């Protein structure tokens, strides 16, 4: 893509960028088994030995076993069963992620059991790691003083997928719970509500996390303005996403997208008082042109306006509010290799 970026309406950078390139292999064997491998060439591994012993660039390395018509087991590095359309949809369809989805541990090694109740209802029961590297990689500024690393860095997730109105209405809801550090846990509630019936595709996502220590680093980064940063304890994040796609014609698609996000400290301590520290909203407009029928080749023009508002509590650390704009003219293509 050709990207032109601005900060506070002043030119920041104009450059060509390859936002996403991936190698993907998938297939099956012996009728009941499947495999899926995917490596991103835009991701960089952590300097320390990863928890799962895999390069951070490997997003998927999993094998599925269809036990019967109802049950399927999946083992290996796989998507965490978070919900929300933006989180779950193929990443090549997303031009700009919310801060929430850009910082969650979405691909982890673990085990998933899927139960298909019928054609309209499916449940997933999953246990995975909650991080790829060690704790030093997970927390941007290290653990707070007196907090010890966890010996059980796992995340348990329960998910429900429901389909209604001839599969036009798609609901996906998940609950997740795990341990970030000793006596410091994390809880996620994520949900996606989708309407997909041509020529419209619309969705509303709600994402919430409550964290004993700030694993996303979005609040903690305000402390690093005047020196070394500090990982903030007892934070929560809330994000809501609205998107509406309209297929104008067989070769044209347009969408508008809006995101609102909030980051809070829910319990005061010696350094941080409780309350809201950041509010973020962004608006996106995109036009997509498909020059070929039945092809994933598309050209797009994407406009982004993002406002990061830091409250007085955050500004007391020296951080400042700002806004960001970006214009992108790009190309997306899935190249099949047999």
Feature roles, as predicted:
Residues 102, 149, 233:
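Glycine- and other small-residue-rich loops at beta-strand/loop junctions that grip anionic moieties
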Residues 28-31, 103-109, 144-145, 202-209, ...:
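Short C-terminal domain-edge/linker segments immediately following a structured domain
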Residues 47-50, 139-146, 315:
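Low-complexity, polar-biased intrinsically disordered regions enriched in Pro/Ser/Thr/Gly
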Residues 126, 130-187:
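Loop-centered beta-sheet repeat module
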Residues 19-23, 56-63, 107-111, 154-158, ...:
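Hydrophobic, lipid-facing positions within transmembrane beta-strands of outer-membrane proteins
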Residues 86-88, 137-138, 216:
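Short aromatic-enriched loop/helix-cap "lid" or pocket-rim segments at secondary-structure transitions
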Residues 7-12, 50-51, 165-338:
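Outer-membrane beta-barrel pore domains
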Residues 1-3, 11-133, 162-165:
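Outer membrane beta-barrel
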């Amino acid at each position: 893509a050709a990207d032109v970026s601005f900060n506070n309406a002043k030119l920041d950078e104009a450059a060509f960028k390859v936002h996403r390139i991936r190698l993907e292999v998938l297939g099956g064997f012996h009728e009941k088994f499947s495999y899926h491998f995917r490596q991103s060439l835009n991701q960089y591994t952590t300097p320390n030995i990863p928890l799962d012993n895999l390069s951070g660039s490997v997003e998927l390395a999993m094998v599925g076993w269809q036990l019967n018509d109802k049950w399927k087991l999946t083992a290996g590095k796989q998507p965490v069963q978070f919900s929300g359309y933006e989180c779950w949809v193929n990443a090549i369809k997303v031009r700009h992620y919310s801060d929430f989805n850009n910082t969650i541990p979405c691909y982890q090694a673990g085990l998933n059991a899927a139960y298909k109740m019928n054609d309209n209802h499916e449940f997933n029961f999953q246990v995975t790691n909650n991080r790829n590297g060690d704790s030093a990689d997970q927390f941007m500024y290290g653990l707070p003083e007196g907090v010890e690393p966890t010996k059980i860095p796992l995340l348990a997730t329960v998910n429900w997928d429901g389909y209604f109105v001839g599969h036009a209405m798609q609901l996906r809801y998940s609950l997740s719970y795990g341990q970030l550090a000793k006596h410091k846990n994390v809880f996620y509630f994520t949900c996606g509500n989708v309407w997909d019936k041509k020529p419209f595709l619309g969705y509303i996502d709600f994402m919430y996390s409550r964290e004993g220590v700030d694993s996303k680093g979005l609040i903690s980064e305000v402390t690093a303005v005047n020196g070394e940063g500090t990982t903030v304890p007892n934070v929560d994040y809330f994000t809501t996403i609205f998107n509406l796609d309209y297929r104008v014609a067989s070769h044209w698609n347009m969408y508008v997208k809006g995101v609102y996000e909030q980051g809070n400290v829910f319990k005061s301590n010696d350094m941080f008082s409780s309350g809201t520290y950041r509010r973020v909203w962004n608006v996106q407009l995109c036009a997509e042109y498909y020059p070929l029928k039945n092809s994933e080749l598309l050209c797009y023009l994407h406009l982004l306006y993002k406002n990061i508002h830091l409250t007085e509590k955050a500004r007391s650390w020296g951080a400042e509010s700002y806004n960001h704009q970006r214009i992108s003219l790009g190309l997306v293509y899935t190249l099949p290799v047999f």
